[in-house]
C-alpha cells in the first residue's frame, strides 16, 4: 500500500481495490511522510488527496492525523508499528496514529488526544480507541537501553528483553481517562503472521507496508 517502501508498482491499484468496497475514493486519501516522531496534524477539507497519489505532497514529518471533516479519509502505513484508531462519537472527530517505539516514547497518543480535546472538545470518557495489528510482546525483542525509555511494558524472558508496545499505549489511554470498555484490540502480531502481514523486524527495510484508514461517513 505504500508509495515509498517495498514493491510499489501496484500500490495505487491496491489502494483503489481495497477502498472501493468501503465506498472510499483512493484519490481522496490524506497521508503522511511518517518519521517516527510525535507531530500531530489537523486535516482540513482543503487537504483532501494529499499523499494519495504521490509521496511528495504528503504531510512531512507527521505521525498522527486528526479531522472533524466528513468524507475525508486518513491513512497511516505500518509494518510492525502500532496503528491507533480514535473516534469521538459525541463531537464527531477522528484520529489515526502511527505509534512506533519512538513515537510511543514521545507520547504521541497523548498528544493526539490533547489536540482532539482542544479542537473538538473531545472528552476522553467518550473516546473509542482501537489498536490494529502490530508486533507484540511475544516477538518484540529490544535492548537493555529501553529501560531508559520506558518504566512500564518491559519483560525479560530467557535472558532477552521484550517490549509491550500495545500495553504501553493502552495504559496511556487509560491514564488519560479512556474507559477500558471503549478500548478495542485486534490482538494480532504482525511478526507471528508472515502470510498475512508485513513485518519490518522479520523482512528488513525493503518490506512493504499495510495501510490503516479511518473516515467520518
Feature-to-residue mapping (PLM):
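Active-site microenvironment for binding and transforming phosphate-containing groups
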Residues: 1-217
Amino acid at each position: 500500500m505504500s508509495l515509498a517502501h517495498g514493491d510499489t508498482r501496484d500500490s495505487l491499484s491496491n489502494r483503489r481495490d481495497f477502498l472501493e468496497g468501503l465506498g472510499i475514493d483512493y484519490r481522496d486519501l490524506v497521508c503522511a511522510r511518517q518519521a517516527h516522531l510525535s507531530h500531530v496534524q489537523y486535516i482540513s477539507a482543503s487537504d483532501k488527496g494529499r499523499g494519495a497519489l504521490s509521496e511528495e505532497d504528503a504531510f512531512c514529518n507527521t505521525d498522527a492525523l486528526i479531522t472533524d471533516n466528513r468524507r475525508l479519509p486518513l491513512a497511516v502505513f505500518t509494518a510492525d508499528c502500532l496503528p491507533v484508531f480514535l473516534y469521538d462519537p459525541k463531537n464527531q472527530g477522528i484520529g489515526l496514529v502511527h505509534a512506533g517505539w519512538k513515537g510511543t516514547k514521545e507520547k504521541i497518543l497523548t498528544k493526539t488526544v490533547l489536540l482532539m480535546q482542544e479542537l473538538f472538545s473531545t472528552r476522553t470518557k467518550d473516546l473509542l480507541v482501537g489498536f490494529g495489528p502490530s508486533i507484540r510482546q511475544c516477538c518484540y525483542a529490544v535492548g537493555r537501553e529501553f529501560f531508559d525509555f520506558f518504566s512500564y511494558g518491559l519483560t525479560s524472558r530467557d535472558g532477552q528483553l521484550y517490549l509491550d508496545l500495545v500495553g504501553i499505549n493502552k495504559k496511556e489511554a487509560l491514564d488519560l481517562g479512556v474507559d477500558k470498555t471503549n478500548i478495542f484490540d485486534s490482538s494480532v502480531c504482525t511478526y507471528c503472521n508472515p502470510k498475512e502481514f508485513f513485518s519490518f523486524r522479520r523482512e528488513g527495510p525493503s518490506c512493504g507496508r499495510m495501510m490503516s484508514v479511518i473516515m467520518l461517513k
